[in-house]
A protein has these predicted regions:
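Accessory alpha-helical/coil subdomains and C-terminal extensions
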Residues: 1-9, 29-90
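Short hydrophobic alpha-helical runs that function as membrane-insertion/retention elements
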Residues: 11-13
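Short, ordered loop/turn segments at secondary-structure junctions
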Residues: 15-21
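A broad, low-specificity signal for short, low-complexity segments enriched in glycine/proline
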Residues: 21-22, 78
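Conserved phosphate-handling catalytic cores of large alpha/beta enzymes
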Residues: 25
Length: 90
């Protein structure tokens, strides 16, 4: 509206983005892919760090996502083979 009111020919397009991937009518949102890759990479590093200890342990990782679990689900990308960690994703 402002551009039109000052006589400018500029056209503006708005593109919603969220790393949570929780917008309706979209397959995926801008920002989700890089956030999912970051989560998977971080979880992989946590797994590698936890594997150096001789004692068995449980590691709990909290991942953001408001009311959507897409980023949490993306942590499964850290798996290298069936049965690899993360074992439980909630």
């Amino acid at each position: 509206r402002y551009a039109a009111s000052v006589g400018s020919d500029i056209r503006i397009i708005g593109e919603p983005k969220t790393i949570d991937n929780d917008l309706v009518c979209t397959d995926h949102t801008l920002g989700f892919g890089s956030a999912a890759r970051y989560v998977a990479s971080t979880v992989r590093e946590i797994i590698l760090d936890a594997n150096v200890y001789e004692k068995n342990s449980v590691t709990i990782v909290e991942i953001m996502g408001r009311h959507a679990g897409w980023l949490t689900g993306a942590s499964a990308l850290a798996r290298r083979y069936d049965g690899d960690n993360p074992l439980l994703i909630y």
